[in-house]
């Protein structure tokens, strides 16, 4: 089994504590409300919301896929780090065993956040992941992130 790693970084004007609350801790409620084309709903199928929890995410009409299952691998609220894996769903296909993510929110000098994301694609056999496929997924994630950021800018009292 090969592992393909992809790192990306982008910025936000929203400070890490507020962004983490919206983007990580309340994403299951917030995203279906503000971006139903991306995520229709999310439900916990196993666990209590902490490490080890498995969630089924029903993707919206704007997605080419129907669902994914996320497993929470790490949740560090003090340092704004979130680790999770996509362990099932039509989005990972038959060539990938799982995709593990580490998201870190770091304070930027301007008072906003630097979002550092590392993805590990655990491939079945000697399959190679095309970088264009990964970049397309990252562009969708960045678009969803901007929707969340715009929601927070429009609602300055939310998630404080």
From Swiss-Prot:
Would the keyword Hydrolase turn up in this protein's UniProt record? yes
- The organism's superkingdom is given as Eukaryota
What tissues is it present in?
Answer: Highly expressed in roots. Expressed a low levels in ripe red fruits.
Q: Which Pfam families match?
A: Bet_v_1
Q: So what family is this one in?
A: Belongs to the BetVI family.
Post-translational modification (record): Phosphorylated in vivo. Phosphorylation prevents its activity as ribonuclease.
- What is the main EC category here? hydrolase
Read off the PROSITE patterns from this record: PATHOGENESIS_BETVI
Tell me, what is one Gene Ontology molecular-function annotation carried by this entry?
A: signaling receptor activity
Stored SUPFAM superfamilies:
Bet v1-like
Q: Does the keyword Phosphoprotein apply?
A: yes
InterPro entries tied to this protein: Bet_v_I/MLP, Bet_v_I_allergen, Plant_def-hormone_signal, START-like_dom_sf
Q: What is the lineage of its organism?
A: Eukaryota, Viridiplantae, Streptophyta, Embryophyta, Tracheophyta
What protein does this entry describe?
Major strawberry allergen Fra a 1.08
EC number(s) in its UniProt entry?
Answer: 3.1.27.-
What function does the entry list?
Possesses ribonuclease activity in vitro.
Q: Could you name the Gene Ontology cellular component terms for this entry?
A: cytoplasm; nucleus
Keywords attached to this Swiss-Prot or TrEMBL record, sorted alphabetically, are: Allergen, Hydrolase, Nuclease, Pathogenesis-related protein, Phosphoprotein, Plant defense
Which biological process terms from the Gene Ontology are attached to this UniProt entry?
Answer: abscisic acid-activated signaling pathway; defense response
